[in-house]
Swiss-Prot record:
Protein family per UniProt: Belongs to the G-protein coupled receptor 1 family.
Recorded name of the encoding gene: MC1R
Protein name per Swiss-Prot or TrEMBL: Melanocyte-stimulating hormone receptor
Ranges per topology, Cytoplasmic: 64-72, 141-163, 212-240, 301-317
Function per UniProt: Receptor for MSH (alpha, beta and gamma) and ACTH. The activity of this receptor is mediated by G proteins which activate adenylate cyclase. Mediates melanogenesis, the production of eumelanin (black/brown) and phaeomelanin (red/yellow), via regulation of cAMP signaling in melanocytes.
Membrane topology field: Multi-pass membrane protein
InterPro entries assigned to the protein according to its UniProt record, in alphabetical order: GPCR_Rhodpsn, GPCR_Rhodpsn_7TM, Melcrt_ACTH_rcpt, MSH_rcpt
Organism this protein belongs to: Alces alces alces (European moose)
Pfam family, one: 7tm_1
Lipidation (S-palmitoyl cysteine): 315
A cellular component term, taken from the record's GO annotations: plasma membrane
Keyword Ligase applies: no
Residue ranges annotated as Extracellular topological domain: 1-37, 94-118, 184-191, 267-279
Compartment annotation: Cell membrane
Length: 317
Protein backbone atom coordinates (compact mmCIF):
# COMPACT_ATOMS: atom_id res chain seq x y z
CA UNK A 1 0.00 0.00 0.00
CA UNK A 2 1.33 3.47 -0.78
CA UNK A 3 1.82 4.96 2.65
CA UNK A 4 4.29 7.21 4.36
CA UNK A 5 5.26 7.16 7.99
CA UNK A 6 3.94 4.40 10.25
CA UNK A 7 2.52 1.51 8.28
CA UNK A 8 1.30 -2.01 8.86
CA UNK A 9 3.44 -4.14 6.59
CA UNK A 10 4.42 -7.75 7.09
CA UNK A 11 8.05 -7.09 6.19
CA UNK A 12 8.36 -4.82 9.19
CA UNK A 13 7.49 -7.75 11.43
CA UNK A 14 10.65 -9.58 10.41
CA UNK A 15 12.54 -7.14 12.63
CA UNK A 16 10.70 -8.61 15.67
CA UNK A 17 9.77 -5.22 17.10
CA UNK A 18 7.68 -5.17 20.30
CA UNK A 19 3.91 -5.18 19.75
CA UNK A 20 2.17 -1.83 19.98
CA UNK A 21 -0.22 -0.81 22.72
CA UNK A 22 -3.00 1.73 22.33
CA UNK A 23 -1.73 5.19 23.15
CA UNK A 24 -2.03 8.86 22.29
CA UNK A 25 1.39 10.46 22.06
CA UNK A 26 2.92 13.70 20.87
CA UNK A 27 5.69 12.55 18.59
CA UNK A 28 8.58 15.00 18.55
CA UNK A 29 9.28 16.57 15.18
CA UNK A 30 12.49 18.52 14.99
CA UNK A 31 11.62 20.20 11.71
CA UNK A 32 8.04 21.13 12.50
CA UNK A 33 5.20 21.03 15.03
CA UNK A 34 4.62 18.21 17.48
CA UNK A 35 2.57 15.38 16.02
CA UNK A 36 -0.41 13.70 17.67
CA UNK A 37 0.09 10.02 16.89
CA UNK A 38 -2.51 7.37 17.73
CA UNK A 39 -0.90 3.97 18.19
CA UNK A 40 -3.25 1.08 17.38
CA UNK A 41 -2.24 -2.29 18.88
CA UNK A 42 -2.38 -5.42 16.75
CA UNK A 43 -4.85 -6.94 19.21
CA UNK A 44 -7.35 -4.16 18.49
CA UNK A 45 -6.95 -4.66 14.73
CA UNK A 46 -7.57 -8.37 15.24
CA UNK A 47 -10.63 -7.79 17.43
CA UNK A 48 -12.21 -5.31 15.00
CA UNK A 49 -11.55 -7.66 12.10
CA UNK A 50 -13.14 -10.63 13.89
CA UNK A 51 -16.26 -8.64 14.87
CA UNK A 52 -16.69 -7.44 11.29
CA UNK A 53 -16.05 -10.96 10.01
CA UNK A 54 -18.81 -12.47 12.16
CA UNK A 55 -21.30 -9.69 11.36
CA UNK A 56 -20.89 -9.90 7.60
CA UNK A 57 -20.88 -13.71 7.53
CA UNK A 58 -24.25 -13.59 9.30
CA UNK A 59 -25.60 -11.13 6.72
CA UNK A 60 -24.50 -13.33 3.82
CA UNK A 61 -25.90 -16.46 5.51
CA UNK A 62 -29.27 -14.82 6.22
CA UNK A 63 -29.70 -13.56 2.64
CA UNK A 64 -28.65 -16.94 1.22
CA UNK A 65 -31.11 -18.80 3.48
CA UNK A 66 -34.27 -16.74 2.87
CA UNK A 67 -35.62 -16.88 -0.69
CA UNK A 68 -37.73 -13.79 0.03
CA UNK A 69 -34.46 -11.87 0.21
CA UNK A 70 -33.32 -13.02 -3.23
CA UNK A 71 -33.93 -9.65 -4.88
CA UNK A 72 -31.60 -7.07 -6.47
CA UNK A 73 -31.62 -4.82 -3.39
CA UNK A 74 -30.58 -7.61 -1.05
CA UNK A 75 -28.06 -8.96 -3.54
CA UNK A 76 -26.36 -5.54 -3.48
CA UNK A 77 -26.42 -5.62 0.34
CA UNK A 78 -25.01 -9.16 0.25
CA UNK A 79 -22.18 -8.07 -2.05
CA UNK A 80 -21.45 -5.13 0.25
CA UNK A 81 -21.20 -7.63 3.10
CA UNK A 82 -18.82 -9.78 1.03
CA UNK A 83 -16.67 -6.71 0.32
CA UNK A 84 -16.56 -5.85 4.02
CA UNK A 85 -15.88 -9.52 4.69
CA UNK A 86 -12.79 -9.36 2.48
CA UNK A 87 -11.61 -6.27 4.35
CA UNK A 88 -11.97 -8.22 7.59
CA UNK A 89 -10.32 -11.39 6.27
CA UNK A 90 -7.32 -9.51 4.89
CA UNK A 91 -6.95 -7.57 8.14
CA UNK A 92 -7.22 -10.69 10.32
CA UNK A 93 -4.79 -12.58 8.09
CA UNK A 94 -2.24 -9.77 8.05
CA UNK A 95 -2.47 -9.19 11.80
CA UNK A 96 -2.22 -12.90 12.62
CA UNK A 97 0.86 -13.35 10.43
CA UNK A 98 2.47 -10.23 11.90
CA UNK A 99 1.89 -11.51 15.45
CA UNK A 100 3.31 -14.93 14.57
CA UNK A 101 6.38 -13.37 12.96
CA UNK A 102 6.96 -11.07 15.93
CA UNK A 103 6.63 -13.98 18.37
CA UNK A 104 9.03 -16.11 16.33
CA UNK A 105 6.37 -18.81 15.92
CA UNK A 106 6.47 -18.50 12.14
CA UNK A 107 9.64 -18.62 10.11
CA UNK A 108 9.45 -17.22 6.59
CA UNK A 109 11.82 -15.77 4.05
CA UNK A 110 11.51 -12.12 3.12
CA UNK A 111 10.53 -13.02 -0.46
CA UNK A 112 7.64 -15.19 0.73
CA UNK A 113 6.45 -12.51 3.15
CA UNK A 114 6.64 -9.93 0.34
CA UNK A 115 4.42 -12.07 -1.89
CA UNK A 116 1.93 -12.58 0.93
CA UNK A 117 1.95 -8.86 1.61
CA UNK A 118 1.20 -8.13 -2.05
CA UNK A 119 -1.72 -10.59 -2.03
CA UNK A 120 -3.16 -8.98 1.09
CA UNK A 121 -2.75 -5.51 -0.44
CA UNK A 122 -4.68 -6.64 -3.54
CA UNK A 123 -7.44 -8.03 -1.30
CA UNK A 124 -7.63 -4.83 0.74
CA UNK A 125 -7.63 -2.51 -2.26
CA UNK A 126 -10.12 -4.60 -4.24
CA UNK A 127 -12.50 -4.88 -1.30
CA UNK A 128 -12.30 -1.12 -0.68
CA UNK A 129 -13.18 -0.29 -4.29
CA UNK A 130 -15.99 -2.87 -4.43
CA UNK A 131 -17.37 -1.67 -1.08
CA UNK A 132 -17.58 1.91 -2.36
CA UNK A 133 -19.20 0.72 -5.60
CA UNK A 134 -21.86 -1.33 -3.83
CA UNK A 135 -22.64 1.57 -1.48
CA UNK A 136 -23.31 3.62 -4.62
CA UNK A 137 -25.34 0.77 -6.15
CA UNK A 138 -27.52 0.54 -3.02
CA UNK A 139 -28.14 4.29 -3.16
CA UNK A 140 -29.11 4.06 -6.84
CA UNK A 141 -31.41 1.10 -6.16
CA UNK A 142 -33.22 3.00 -3.40
CA UNK A 143 -33.47 6.10 -5.58
CA UNK A 144 -35.08 4.17 -8.45
CA UNK A 145 -37.48 2.42 -6.05
CA UNK A 146 -38.73 5.82 -4.82
CA UNK A 147 -38.78 7.94 -7.98
CA UNK A 148 -39.67 5.19 -10.46
CA UNK A 149 -41.72 2.91 -8.21
CA UNK A 150 -44.09 1.72 -10.96
CA UNK A 151 -41.23 0.86 -13.31
CA UNK A 152 -38.82 -0.42 -10.65
CA UNK A 153 -39.23 -4.14 -11.38
CA UNK A 154 -38.78 -3.57 -15.11
CA UNK A 155 -35.72 -1.34 -14.62
CA UNK A 156 -33.95 -3.22 -11.82
CA UNK A 157 -34.25 -6.82 -13.02
CA UNK A 158 -32.28 -9.77 -11.68
CA UNK A 159 -30.23 -10.26 -14.90
CA UNK A 160 -29.38 -6.57 -14.96
CA UNK A 161 -28.44 -6.64 -11.27
CA UNK A 162 -26.18 -9.65 -11.82
CA UNK A 163 -24.45 -7.87 -14.71
CA UNK A 164 -23.87 -4.82 -12.51
CA UNK A 165 -22.50 -7.01 -9.71
CA UNK A 166 -20.17 -8.85 -12.09
CA UNK A 167 -18.95 -5.57 -13.61
CA UNK A 168 -18.21 -4.15 -10.15
CA UNK A 169 -16.19 -7.19 -9.09
CA UNK A 170 -14.20 -7.29 -12.33
CA UNK A 171 -13.52 -3.55 -12.14
CA UNK A 172 -12.48 -3.87 -8.49
CA UNK A 173 -10.02 -6.67 -9.23
CA UNK A 174 -8.48 -4.80 -12.17
CA UNK A 175 -8.31 -1.57 -10.15
CA UNK A 176 -6.57 -3.28 -7.24
CA UNK A 177 -3.99 -4.88 -9.55
CA UNK A 178 -3.29 -1.54 -11.24
CA UNK A 179 -3.13 0.22 -7.90
CA UNK A 180 -0.62 -2.22 -6.41
CA UNK A 181 1.48 -2.25 -9.60
CA UNK A 182 1.54 1.52 -10.19
CA UNK A 183 0.97 2.85 -6.66
CA UNK A 184 3.92 5.24 -7.00
CA UNK A 185 2.27 7.03 -9.93
CA UNK A 186 0.48 10.25 -9.03
CA UNK A 187 -2.29 9.69 -11.59
CA UNK A 188 -3.31 6.40 -9.96
CA UNK A 189 -3.61 7.98 -6.52
CA UNK A 190 -5.56 10.94 -7.89
CA UNK A 191 -7.95 8.61 -9.71
CA UNK A 192 -8.67 6.75 -6.47
CA UNK A 193 -9.26 9.99 -4.58
CA UNK A 194 -11.47 11.26 -7.41
CA UNK A 195 -13.44 8.01 -7.31
CA UNK A 196 -14.09 8.45 -3.58
CA UNK A 197 -15.22 12.07 -4.06
CA UNK A 198 -17.50 11.00 -6.92
CA UNK A 199 -19.09 8.26 -4.76
CA UNK A 200 -19.55 10.69 -1.86
CA UNK A 201 -21.16 13.28 -4.15
CA UNK A 202 -23.40 10.66 -5.79
CA UNK A 203 -24.64 9.34 -2.45
CA UNK A 204 -25.19 12.85 -1.06
CA UNK A 205 -27.19 13.97 -4.12
CA UNK A 206 -29.33 10.83 -4.24
CA UNK A 207 -30.10 10.66 -0.53
CA UNK A 208 -30.81 14.40 -0.23
CA UNK A 209 -33.18 14.14 -3.19
CA UNK A 210 -34.87 11.11 -1.58
CA UNK A 211 -35.24 13.01 1.70
CA UNK A 212 -36.81 15.95 -0.14
CA UNK A 213 -39.29 13.62 -1.88
CA UNK A 214 -40.14 11.92 1.44
CA UNK A 215 -40.78 15.30 3.08
CA UNK A 216 -42.99 16.34 0.15
CA UNK A 217 -44.90 13.07 0.46
CA UNK A 218 -45.37 13.66 4.21
CA UNK A 219 -46.70 17.18 3.48
CA UNK A 220 -49.20 15.78 0.98
CA UNK A 221 -50.45 13.19 3.47
CA UNK A 222 -50.71 15.80 6.23
CA UNK A 223 -52.68 18.09 3.90
CA UNK A 224 -55.11 15.31 2.99
CA UNK A 225 -55.60 14.31 6.61
CA UNK A 226 -55.67 17.97 7.74
CA UNK A 227 -52.91 17.45 10.28
CA UNK A 228 -50.80 20.13 11.88
CA UNK A 229 -47.42 21.27 10.55
CA UNK A 230 -45.31 20.07 13.54
CA UNK A 231 -45.91 16.44 12.51
CA UNK A 232 -44.22 17.14 9.20
CA UNK A 233 -41.39 18.93 10.97
CA UNK A 234 -40.81 15.89 13.18
CA UNK A 235 -40.68 13.65 10.11
CA UNK A 236 -38.23 15.98 8.40
CA UNK A 237 -35.95 16.10 11.43
CA UNK A 238 -35.98 12.30 11.69
CA UNK A 239 -35.14 11.95 8.01
CA UNK A 240 -32.38 14.55 8.25
CA UNK A 241 -30.91 12.74 11.26
CA UNK A 242 -30.91 9.43 9.35
CA UNK A 243 -29.28 11.10 6.35
CA UNK A 244 -26.64 12.74 8.56
CA UNK A 245 -25.77 9.41 10.19
CA UNK A 246 -25.59 7.59 6.85
CA UNK A 247 -23.37 10.12 5.07
CA UNK A 248 -21.47 11.04 8.25
CA UNK A 249 -20.39 7.47 8.92
CA UNK A 250 -19.34 7.07 5.28
CA UNK A 251 -17.26 10.26 5.32
CA UNK A 252 -15.70 9.78 8.76
CA UNK A 253 -14.68 6.18 8.08
CA UNK A 254 -13.39 6.59 4.52
CA UNK A 255 -12.38 10.26 4.39
CA UNK A 256 -9.13 10.07 6.44
CA UNK A 257 -7.72 7.26 4.27
CA UNK A 258 -8.32 9.18 1.05
CA UNK A 259 -7.03 12.36 2.68
CA UNK A 260 -3.85 10.38 3.33
CA UNK A 261 -3.62 9.46 -0.37
CA UNK A 262 -4.24 13.07 -1.38
CA UNK A 263 -1.48 14.40 0.87
CA UNK A 264 0.99 11.87 -0.54
CA UNK A 265 0.53 13.70 -3.84
CA UNK A 266 0.19 17.26 -2.53
CA UNK A 267 2.76 17.52 0.27
CA UNK A 268 4.80 14.34 0.81
CA UNK A 269 7.67 16.22 2.51
CA UNK A 270 5.76 18.82 4.52
CA UNK A 271 6.07 18.40 8.33
CA UNK A 272 2.34 18.88 8.94
CA UNK A 273 1.47 16.26 6.33
CA UNK A 274 4.07 14.02 7.95
CA UNK A 275 2.06 14.19 11.18
CA UNK A 276 -0.99 12.91 9.32
CA UNK A 277 1.01 10.11 7.69
CA UNK A 278 1.95 8.82 11.15
CA UNK A 279 -1.70 7.95 11.81
CA UNK A 280 -2.17 5.64 8.82
CA UNK A 281 -2.97 2.72 11.16
CA UNK A 282 -5.83 4.75 12.62
CA UNK A 283 -7.21 5.36 9.12
CA UNK A 284 -7.18 1.61 8.43
CA UNK A 285 -8.93 0.97 11.74
CA UNK A 286 -11.67 3.42 10.74
CA UNK A 287 -12.24 1.52 7.48
CA UNK A 288 -12.61 -1.70 9.49
CA UNK A 289 -15.07 0.13 11.76
CA UNK A 290 -17.05 1.01 8.64
CA UNK A 291 -17.22 -2.71 7.82
CA UNK A 292 -18.73 -3.21 11.29
CA UNK A 293 -21.25 -0.37 10.93
CA UNK A 294 -22.42 -1.19 7.38
CA UNK A 295 -24.54 -4.22 8.42
CA UNK A 296 -26.21 -2.10 11.12
CA UNK A 297 -27.16 0.60 8.59
CA UNK A 298 -28.01 -1.41 5.48
CA UNK A 299 -28.89 -4.95 6.59
CA UNK A 300 -30.07 -5.32 10.18
CA UNK A 301 -32.71 -2.59 9.80
CA UNK A 302 -34.72 -5.02 7.65
CA UNK A 303 -37.29 -6.89 9.74
CA UNK A 304 -37.29 -9.83 7.31
CA UNK A 305 -33.50 -10.12 7.48
CA UNK A 306 -33.48 -9.85 11.28
CA UNK A 307 -36.04 -12.65 11.50
CA UNK A 308 -33.94 -14.85 9.21
CA UNK A 309 -30.84 -13.97 11.21
CA UNK A 310 -32.52 -15.25 14.37
CA UNK A 311 -33.28 -18.53 12.58
CA UNK A 312 -29.65 -18.82 11.45
CA UNK A 313 -28.40 -18.24 14.99
CA UNK A 314 -30.85 -20.78 16.41
CA UNK A 315 -29.74 -23.38 13.86
CA UNK A 316 -26.09 -22.75 14.73
CA UNK A 317 -26.83 -23.55 18.38
Amino acid sequence: MPVLGSQRRLLGSLNCTPPATFSLTLAPNRTGPQCLEVSIPDGLFLSLGLVSLVENVLVVAAIAKNRNLHSPMYYFICCLAVSDLLVSVSNVLETAVMLLLEAGALAARAAVVQQLDNVIDVLICGSMVSSLCFLGAIAMDRYISIFYALRYHSVVTLPRAWRIIAAIWVASILTSLLFITYYNHTVVLLCLVGFFIAMLALMAILYVHMLARACQHARDIARLQKRQHPIHQGFGLKGAATLTILLGVFFLCWGPFFLHLSLIVLCPQHPTCGCIFKNFNLFLALIICNAIVDPLIYAFRSQELRKTLQEVLQCSW
